[in-house]
């Protein structure tokens, strides 16, 4: 397709996508060998496995890696989250759930330990400042 035909096609359609309509059609199909008056009803059941949503906690792990990386637990949680996402893309739901569970535990421990360290640091600074003020008075 050369450039002039492409320009002609886009100019003819006005640059907008074509308008599609849904057409519903029904057909009757008679079974071979069966009389028309006594048609048997057959039921077909199709079991469709429902898509299991496995949370991989990648965003939480990335946040912990960037902002609360206590003893590199956030980075390890991020690695497990990526493994969980890879397993989910392959279709291994059990493996994805196992990696996601490990990532969740690591994220919780990272969050708790990091908050605990922030609180200990703030309390330590307050105690040091108060002791320094008492020594100067």
Curated annotation (Swiss-Prot):
Spans within the Cytoplasmic topological domain: 1-57, 79-109
Lipidation (S-palmitoyl cysteine): 71-72, 105
Expression induction: By alpha interferon. Induced in pancreas during caerulein-induced pancreatitis. Induced in pancreas under systemic-lipopolysaccharide treatment and in intestine under Salmonella infection.
Membrane topology note: Single-pass type II membrane protein
Principal location: membrane
Pfam families per UniProt: CD225
Region listing for Interaction with SPP1, in residue ranges: 60-93
Extracellular compartment spans: 131-137
PTMs per UniProt: Polyubiquitinated with both 'Lys-48' and 'Lys-63' linkages. Ubiquitination negatively regulates antiviral activity. Lys-24 is the most prevalent ubiquitination site.
Tissue specificity as recorded in UniProt: Expressed in acinar cell. Predominantly expressed in nascent primordial germ cells, as well as in gonadal germ cells.
The keyword Oxidoreductase is annotated on this UniProt entry: no
Keywords, in A-Z order: Antiviral defense, Cell membrane, Cytoplasm, Endosome, Immunity, Innate immunity, Isopeptide bond, Lipoprotein, Lysosome, Membrane, Palmitate, Phosphoprotein, Signal-anchor, Transmembrane, Transmembrane helix, Ubl conjugation
Region (Interaction with VAPA): 108-133
GO CC term, one of those recorded: cytoplasmic vesicle
Localisation: Cell membrane; Late endosome membrane; Early endosome membrane; Lysosome membrane
Modified residues (Phosphotyrosine): 20, 27
Cross-link type Glycyl lysine isopeptide (Lys-Gly) (interchain with G-Cter in ubiquitin), residue numbers: 24, 83, 88, 104
Transmembrane segments: 110-130
Intramembrane segments: 58-78
BP term (GO), one: response to virus
Protein family according to the UniProt entry: Belongs to the CD225/Dispanin family.
Role this protein plays: IFN-induced antiviral protein which disrupts intracellular cholesterol homeostasis. Inhibits the entry of viruses to the host cell cytoplasm by preventing viral fusion with cholesterol depleted endosomes. May inactivate new enveloped viruses which buds out of the infected cell, by letting them go out with a cholesterol depleted membrane.
Quaternary organization: Interacts with ATP6V0B. Interacts with CD81. Interacts with SPP1; the interaction reduces OPN expression. Interacts with BRI3.
Protein name (database record): Interferon-induced transmembrane protein 3
Gene designation: Ifitm3
């Amino acid at each position: 397709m050369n450039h002039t035909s492409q320009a002609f096609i886009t100019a003819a359609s006005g640059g907008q996508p074509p308008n599609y309509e849904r057409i519903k059609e029904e057909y009757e199909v008679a079974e071979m060998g069966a009389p028309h008056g006594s048609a048997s009803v057959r039921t077909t059941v199709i079991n469709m496995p429902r898509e299991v949503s496995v949370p991989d906690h990648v965003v939480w792990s990335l946040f912990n890696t960037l902002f609360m990386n206590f003893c590199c637990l956030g980075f390890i949680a991020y690695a497990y989250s990526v493994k969980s996402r890879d397993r989910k893309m392959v279709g291994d739901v059990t493996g994805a759930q196992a990696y996601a569970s490990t990532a969740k535990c690591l994220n919780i421990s990272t969050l708790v330990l990091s908050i605990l360290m922030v609180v200990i640091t703030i309390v330590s600074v307050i105690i040091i400042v108060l002791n320094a003020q008492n020594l100067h008075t």
